[in-house]
Amino acid sequence: MTDNQEIKPKKLTLGNSKLSLNKSFDSLTGAQSFVNAKSKTLVEVRKSSTGSATTLSLNKERNSLDQTVIDANKEEFNRRLSILKKAAEQSQLNDPLKISTLSKLASINQSANSKIEPLETDKEVEQKQQNTEENKVEVSAKIVQDDEDIPSQIPKKKEETFVKSPLVGKRTRYGIESEKELDKTAESKIIAPKIKLEEPKKFKKADLFNMLSDDESGSGRTRSLAAIKRAREKEKRKLVSQAPEKVYREVTIPEAIGVGDLANAMSERVADVIKELMKLGILANASQTIDADTAELVATNLGHTVKRVQESDVENVLISDDKVEDLRTRAPVVTVMGHVDHGKTSLLDSLKSTDIAAGELGGITQHIGAYRVTLADGRAITFIDTPGHEAFSEMRSRGAKVTDIVIIVVAADDGIKTQTVEAINHAKAAGVPIIVAINKIDKPDIDIERVKNELYVHEIIGEEAGGDIMIIPISALKKINLDKLEEAILLIAEMQDLKANPFGSAAGVVIESKIEQGRGTLTTILVQRGTLRNSDIIIAGTAYGKVKKMTNDKGLEIVEATPSVPVEIQGLNEVPFAGDKFNVVQNEKQAKDIAEYRMRLAKEKKISIAPRSSLEDLFLKASGNSKIKELPLIIKGDVQGSVEAISGSLLKLPSDEIKLRILHSGVGPITESDVSLAHASSAIIVGFNVRAGANALTAAEKEKVDIRYYSIIYHLIDDIKAIMSGMLDPIVREQYIGSAEMRQIFNITKVGKIAGSYVTKGIIKKGAGVRLLRDNVVIHEGKLKTLKRFKDEVKEVREGYECGIAFENYQDIREGDTVEVFELIQEQRQL
């Protein structure tokens, strides 16, 4: 063994603290190993066992190695610092924030250098750029080349502990084993310690924010993320709170508008609109309605422009003109009018060869029917059958408005009647041609000339007499002269040149409407222009909806209807009135707007025509001494026209003491809500061709509500008239029954004066009313207190007998006075 064994060079790396040798080696010192925490490189140092001389040489070499590492770290730091300063100078004008950041990083690096912690420089290199690793490799390689077999110990950070490999050696009786053997043994037994590496700390936003937000005073206060979020939200609130630029709009103002609606139209606050109204001297809330002039002033004061529109403009979409080239010839619409039982429906029955009249109760048509008859030559005629009863004058007038020709049916054996005259007046008012059909000429003992003379009285002059009205004798039952009637209709239609536009949106008139269980609202309409198709959206009065199904007068389902074709449709949301015009619109919103406008008009009209009560009537009603009685009614019918006819007839019943009040009228069966309303108002429910449901009947029995059913209209009117007559106060009439002459006066104790009398005429009844006449002057009127025959009390004494008479609370009687006896009789009044 030699004292100076050659030590193989080992790879060195940068440590995190100053290299030092804290422990001296003795002769038994063996090999040591250590691990750098960053490079994880195992360094093995062989120790010489030659004594103190070897130890001194090792210490010198180790000190020189330490100085070399420190110098390399300083050079690396200075190089990086110069790069950072140059970058800061170049971007000084562009990014001052980045310069401050680099300055702070430079100060951090300088403080780390003052503590001589080379490992700190390695951390910065790892965080910044990759070329730092290359510099580290170059420095490590240089150290490995200059120094060989230098044992050293590199201390870690103060939180890390030194790890040493145990001394490896074997004593023998002759001393320690040879150094070479010792080195081999040490190499085989050196174990690399497991060191837990510390992960680099993550760089958070708060750290960067703290570095950037530190003021010059160097307070170094750390801001939390919550504080940063609060600051950001505060900035956002400041931005939101900034008033946006006001937008001025063009405001459309109708005839009346609510304050809230006006504010929405201008995109203004309701409070601002109310302030403007207060400036004008108007106190209003958000739900109050103001007129168009006031709304225009408010909008102008707020800087908006105003566009005035009429509320009726919503109906402008319904108005359209037809082009001449689009017009096509259409079938005539004929209305049949006349008195009850003069043969109107029988005439249509003969024309259609169907038994329509068999379905009419009492032989009276209860509602309008629309039928289309196709003749042998292919031409068609549309007939509208109107009821003849006087209650249906409103329906008849509507029928005259939609017709082209009017046929007035007059019975040859009955002549002109009240409803006949009314039908003539309706036809004249409508300005349509008239054809008179004198029916029932097959009956014996008829006088057609007498009927013609009666027509002359009403200015209905036939062609044979120089007039322009065609008078045709017919027999609907025997089908006599029906062909002449059809020829007359077609001739007049040809002279009128009836045309319509079958293209475009449909329009027409509602003939009748009703509610049918399981099918909903059914409406009979007559198309006057355009073509009506399934799924069209129509508006009729205040009712609107989509056409779900169409059927013709024969009950067959069809997909479209052209002008002069009557159809029954279903799909409306409510029952329209007979005579209402219908139009097809583009969408449901348009229909809804028009319906709402019409409902407002109807409501305003109803309020304006409401009966006004005098102050005296109000006081009498409040005290319960009102002389006017009320009969509340609820009317339900099968079709709208019948309900209107019933209401109109009942309201025409004359009475100054009874006021007929119709609480509700509608189409459909009697419901439980109708019963509840009747119970609350003590009303009578009238059902015309409808019945009450099971629940309604149960409720009516429980609440004792009177429900009456009718199928013929004049029976209903007579019954209501009788009820109103029963409510009238009866007439009290005085009926004379007899007289007596006083012949002698008797004074009886405890009784008073009794007149001995002789019955001269009629009978004297006890309890009847009496008048005492003296010299033909009435001096007292009262009642008989006592009536005696001799000593017996009797109820009456007839003519020619004597009796004793005493008066109630009256004693001034004399001989020769005359007594008249009478009774008060109550008679029921009639309307």
Swiss-Prot record:
UniProt-annotated stretches for the region G3: 385-388
InterPro entries tied to this protein: EF-G-like_DII (IPR053905), EFTu-like_2 (IPR004161), IF2_II (IPR044145), IF2_N (IPR006847), P-loop_NTPase (IPR027417), Small_GTP-bd (IPR005225), T_Tr_GTP-bd_dom (IPR000795), TF_IF2_bacterial-like (IPR000178)
Cytoplasm recorded as keyword: yes
Bias (Basic and acidic residues): 117-139
One MF annotation (Gene Ontology) recorded for this entry: guanosine tetraphosphate binding
UniProt cross-references to Gene3D superfamilies, sorted A to Z: P-loop containing nucleotide triphosphate hydrolases (3.40.50.300), Translation factors (2.40.30.10), Translation initiation factor IF- 2, domain 3 (3.40.50.10050)
Record domain tr-type G: where: 329-499
G5: region residues: 475-477
Location of the region described as Disordered in the Swiss-Prot/TrEMBL record: 116-157
Positions with a binding annotation for GTP: 338-345, 385-389, 439-442
Chain spans, region G2: 363-367
Region (G1): 338-345
Keyword Ubl conjugation included in the entry's annotation: no
Keywords: Cytoplasm, GTP-binding, Initiation factor, Nucleotide-binding, Protein biosynthesis
An annotated GO cellular component: cytoplasm
Any single Pfam family the record assigns to this protein: GTP_EFTU
Region (G4): 439-442
Location of this chain's protein in the cell: Cytoplasm
PROSITE patterns reported in the protein's UniProt record: G_TR_2 (PS51722), IF2 (PS01176)
Domain of life: Bacteria
CDD domains named in the record: IF2_eIF5B, IF2_mtIF2_II, mtIF2_IVc
UniProt-listed NCBIfam families: IF-2 (TIGR00487), small_GTP (TIGR00231)
Family, as annotated: Belongs to the TRAFAC class translation factor GTPase superfamily. Classic translation factor GTPase family. IF-2 subfamily.
HAMAP family registered for this protein in UniProt: IF_2_B
Summary of the function given for this chain in its UniProt record: One of the essential components for the initiation of protein synthesis. Protects formylmethionyl-tRNA from spontaneous hydrolysis and promotes its binding to the 30S ribosomal subunits. Also involved in the hydrolysis of GTP during the formation of the 70S ribosomal complex.
Protein name as catalogued: Translation initiation factor IF-2
Organism name: Rickettsia conorii (strain ATCC VR-613 / Malish 7)
Source lineage: Bacteria, Pseudomonadati, Pseudomonadota, Alphaproteobacteria, Rickettsiales
